[in-house]
C-alpha cells in the first residue's frame, strides 16, 4: 500500500496511528483575528478570483475540511488551509473551524510545502523553491526527493535549475508573464544582463519559445569571445598529483554542467599547486 506523504517525510507516525485507531481529532472554532499565515508558504501569489469563487462555495456549503494550525507566540499559525482562511476572511466571518497540531518548524514547513505540491497552480519557480526547501529540511538528494514525491529525478533537476536565473526572470515566471519553457531557454545565457534584456523582448514582442531559443542562439554568437586563459607552464608532477588535479577539474566541470555558475583559478607555487573555487551564494 502506498505510504502517505507525511510518513515518507518522517513525521506522520503519530497522526497515522490516530487515524488507524479511529481517534477523532478535536475541531476548534478559532477567532480569525488570532490566526496568522504560514511563514513557510511556497505560494507567493494568490488568485483573487479563485479565492472569491471559494468564498462563494463556502458561503453556500460551509467549510467541509477544517484548516490545520499550531500555536506559536500567542497566535495560531496556519499549517494547511490558507486559501480557506483567506476565503473566510473575505466573507467577514469571525471564526473558522481548525485542528490544532503540535508541530515544530520542520514539520510545519514540510506539510505546507507538500500540501501545495499536491495541488495545481504553483508556478515553476514556487515549485522549485518548495523542492529546494524540502531538500534542505530533510537532508535529501534530488534523487531521494524524487522517489518520495513519485516524480522523475530529471523533473526535480530541471525545476531546480530555474533558481539559477536572475531575479527579474524568476519574478516574470511567478507573474506568469513567461512560460517555464521560455525560462529554460534563457538558462543557456548564464548572464543576468542578457537574461533581463531578452526577457524584455519576450514580453514586449510576445516571442514564442522557438523565437526565444533563436534569440538566445544569436546573443551567444554575438557575445565577444572570452580570451583564452594563458596556461601556466607546468612542471613534471607525480602520478598521484596529476590524478588529484584532474579529479578536481572534472568535478568542477560536472558542477558547471549542472547549471551552477562557478569561478575557478589555478596558481602554481614553489611548494604547492593552488585551486581557488568560488561559488556564489545567490541562487
Swiss-Prot record:
Xref: Pfam families: HTH_ParB, ParBc
SUPFAM superfamilies in UniProt: ParB/Sulfiredoxin
One of the record's GO molecular function terms: DNA binding
Superkingdom of source: Bacteria
A GO CC annotation given for this chain: cytoplasm
Function: Effects nucleoid occlusion by binding relatively nonspecifically to DNA and preventing the assembly of the division machinery in the vicinity of the nucleoid, especially under conditions that disturb the cell cycle. It helps to coordinate cell division and chromosome segregation by preventing the formation of the Z ring through the nucleoid, which would cause chromosome breakage.
InterPro entries associated with the record: Chromosome_partition/occlusion, HTH_ParB/Spo0J, Nucleoid_occlusion_protein, ParB/RepB/Spo0J, ParB/Sulfiredoxin_dom, ParB/Sulfiredoxin_sf
The name this protein goes by in its record: Nucleoid occlusion protein
Family of the protein in this entry: Belongs to the ParB family.
Record-linked CDD domains: SPO0J_N (cd16393)
Biased composition (Basic and acidic residues): 13-26
One example of a Gene Ontology biological process annotation: chromosome segregation
Keywords annotated in UniProt: Cell cycle, Cell division, Cytoplasm, DNA-binding, Septation
Gene3D superfamilies: 1.10.10.2830, 3.90.1530.30
Subcellular localization(s) per the UniProt record: Cytoplasm, Nucleoid
Region (Disordered): 1-26
Residue ranges of DNA binding: 143-162
Amino acid at each position: 500500500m502506498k505510504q502517505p506523504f507525511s510518513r515518507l517525510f518522517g513525521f506522520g507516525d503519530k497522526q497515522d496511528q490516530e487515524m488507524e485507531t479511529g481517534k477523532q481529532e478535536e475541531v476548534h472554532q478559532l477567532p480569525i483575528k488570532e490566526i496568522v499565515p504560514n511563514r513557510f508558504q511556497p505560494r507567493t501569489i494568490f488568485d483573487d478570483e479563485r479565492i472569491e469563487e471559494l468564498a462563494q462555495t463556502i458561503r453556500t456549503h460551509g467549510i467541509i475540511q477544517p484548516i490545520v494550525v499550531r500555536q506559536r507566540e500567542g497566535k495560531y499559525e496556519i499549517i494547511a488551509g490558507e486559501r480557506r482562511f483567506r476565503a473566510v476572511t473575505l466573507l467577514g466571518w469571525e471564526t473558522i473551524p481548525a485542528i490544532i497540531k503540535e508541530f515544530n518548524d520542520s514539520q510545519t514547513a514540510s506539510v505546507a510545502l507538500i500540501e501545495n505540491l499536491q495541488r495545481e497552480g504553483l508556478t515553476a519557480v514556487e515549485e522549485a523553491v518548495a523542492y529546494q526547501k524540502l531538500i534542505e529540511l530533510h537532508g535529501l538528494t534530488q534523487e531521494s526527493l524524487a522517489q518520495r514525491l513519485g516524480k522523475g529525478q530529471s523533473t526535480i533537476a530541471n525545476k531546480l535549475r530555474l533558481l539559477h536565473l536572475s531575479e527579474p526572470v524568476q519574478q516574470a515566471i511567478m507573474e506568469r508573464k513567461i512560460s517555464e519553457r521560455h525560462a529554460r531557454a534563457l538558462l543557456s545565457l548564464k548572464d543576468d544582463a542578457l537574461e533581463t534584456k531578452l526577457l524584455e523582448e519576450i514580453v514586449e514582442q510576445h516571442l514564442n519559445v522557438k523565437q526565444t531559443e533563436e534569440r538566445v542562439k544569436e546573443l551567444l554568437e554575438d557575445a565577444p569571445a572570452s580570451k583564452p586563459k594563458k596556461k601556466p607552464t607546468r612542471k613534471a608532477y607525480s602520478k598521484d598529483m596529476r590524478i588529484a588535479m584532474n579529479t578536481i577539474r572534472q568535478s568542477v566541470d560536472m558542477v558547471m554542467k549542472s547549471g551552477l555558475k562557478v569561478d575557478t583559478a589555478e596558481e602554481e607555487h614553489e611548494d604547492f599547486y593552488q585551486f581557488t573555487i568560488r561559488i556564489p551564494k545567490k541562487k
